[in-house]
Amino acid sequence: MRTDGLTGILENLFGELMHGVSGKGGFMLNHKDRGLLRSLERVSAADASVTTRTGSSIAAHVAHVGYGLSLLNRWSQGENPFGGADWAAAWKKTSVTEPEWEALRIQLRDEGAKWLVVLRTPREVQDVELSGMIGSIAHLAYHVGAIRQISVNAVGPAESQR
């Protein structure tokens, strides 16, 4: 199946989650929401290191998403990186220093930018691959929500602030 008819949709939804809402409104986030990357700029390393009752932290969420995007980017280049993937690794390190926090945000930004190019570029895919591409957007939305539940500094604008 070709993704030609879907690339704009995939790009818009993923881009909105990462970079925020442009124009009058969005499909995933509230009007004027700055998106994940700019929200994370307002989170200190100390705040990113606070663990929840389940043991996760914002730093762990960001590491997990950055790692997942790196695997997707490798897949887009013809590799099959999923068999040996260590999904648990990102969740093991919950606290970060300021330099480590900056590095995690840079990795997320860079891997997200690469994945955005993949989403906007028409390609031939199997159903399972298209499911993974669409699933990456839903998965990112989950983590945006989870991060925003952990720290008030990462929260976007309320619907009433339109």
Task: Please provide the spans of the model-predicted regions.
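Acidic/histidine-rich alpha-helical segments that form the ligand environment
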Residues: 90-141
